[in-house]
Amino acid sequence: QQLQEDEDRREPAATTWAAEFLLRSNESRDFLGSWMSSKATHEGAKRRATQVITCSFPCRKWLHMIYPQISPQCELCRRDRAAKGASEDRLPMESVAHIQSAGCRAQKESVINAHNRCWQYLLKAIQEHGNETRKLDFIGDDKDKQLATLWAESRIQEIVEWDELKLIADQLIAQKQGSQRDALSSTNDDHEQDEDEDRQAPYKEVVFEKRRPDSMAIDWTNKKIYVLEFKRTSDQRSNYRSRAEARAAEQHDVLIKSLKEVFQNRFGRQVVWDAKLITFVGGTCGSVNVDKFNEHLEELQVSKGKYRAIRKGLVYELLHAQDKVLCSYFAQRNGHRGAQAPQGAARNDLMHQLSKHE
């Protein structure tokens, strides 16, 4: 515990960030170790994971500390803005967290694919390993469908009518629009711990437009509607899980409150049905909190004998997904090496020499 960092600390409590990361208890580090030592894991993937853990991955933020002539700002974002004729002012830092988030437009597709890969594995495992007595219907596997479409195509409309839910949600959204605009305007892309694929989507987008929960589940026995969300987020800091859970709670606040209000209006004080948000959080470098993960699986009535195997699979998926995102970064960076270089041939030669870090 002595090495644990405080929430607002800008440096580790003792020794190094790597020591703090590796010594965190209850974060599935045994599976990180087995993945790193496995012969099935490519040596390049092991090297890149080690660089992330030791804070020595050769992104521009790290390179700038060694070679000040290299700008710490994201080159991929600069190229994207230049191609669109947009201003190149206030470019975000090219940190590991940034290039693994949808905040980097060039990496957005790769990041979304990484999120979907991990969630599809986890959802399939939950569906396949339920208790014999479980009566749980999962809806929302097709991410292309909006919430209204899912409502019309599933049995959930037997419990909650979409028009009634929409009316209540509209009222809640109207009340929250002002505070939501303030929250969005205060977002700082330079804060590494704020980088995430959701970027705090507005309530309206979550409920009525393209953004929606990763999945939903109806428990017919216990009369609960579960809103299921998966967050793949940077786990450099020890508070990664609480921050991701807070973002998920904010993101789905209107939906959960709307469902609860519909139930209260329909059933009065003796509420028969309830709604609950379950947020699974996976760190980009394989962090999965054991207690919280098991708690969620128990809530979804997964066979206890499968908890460890499912968690191991998720850790491996997270690590493989991270490597694919990092390889995407290298492919885009190196594919344009030398193009539009603002600092001349010297910088190109330097970047070429630094390729050994990859």
Annotated model-derived regions:
Residues 1-93:
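Helix/loop segments that flank and initiate small ligand/metal-binding modules
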Residues 24-29, 97-104, 226-233:
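Surface-exposed beta-strand-to-loop junctions
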Residues 44, 69-72, 113-121, 142, ...:
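Generic recognition of stable, solvent-exposed alpha-helical segments in well-folded globular domains
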Residues 64, 68, 73, 134-230, ...:
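Active-site metal-binding core of divalent-cation-utilizing nuclease and nuclease-like domains
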Residues 65-66, 109-112, 237-244:
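Conserved, non-catalytic sequence blocks in retroelement Pol enzymes and Pol-derived host proteins
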Residues 96-112, 117-121, 125:
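Conserved pre-catalytic core of RNA-dependent polymerases
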Residues 204-214, 219, 223-226, 230-358:
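Catalytic cores of nucleic-acid endonucleases
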